[in-house]
Amino acid sequence: MRFMLMVKATDDSEAGIMPSEEMLREMGAYNEELVKAGVMLAGEGLHPSSKGARVRFSGKERTVMDGPFAETKELVAGFWLIQVSSKEEAVEWVKRCPNPMPGESEIEIRQVFEADDFGDEYTPELREQEERLRAQAADNA
């Protein structure tokens, strides 16, 4: 099972305040633990929403909104993508994580859909296309 672990943004992360050297060392050690355990697939920190944009869809219309975005608690400041055997294991990995922000912070855990989750609508042709695209994307990495 794959899970996305999303570090929620804070006022500090949205202000562009970078982590301390100590925090970078702690996160580096945690990431090394994840990699050595064979569970980490990806992980990155994100720039503040002031450097981002959103595209709103309404039928065929597209509206672009530049950041920053107001609801800091709903924003993501970073993420990991991990592969583990259960949600409980994902929770245990998150509990071992150093606090990613000074003060209070939150990491949201969400399971990633797998091919079998889509049922009969996910035809053999669509599966083949997905596998081909994943292989091409891996080559691009």
State what each model feature region is.
Residues M1-A141:
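Conserved, structured core segments of small domains
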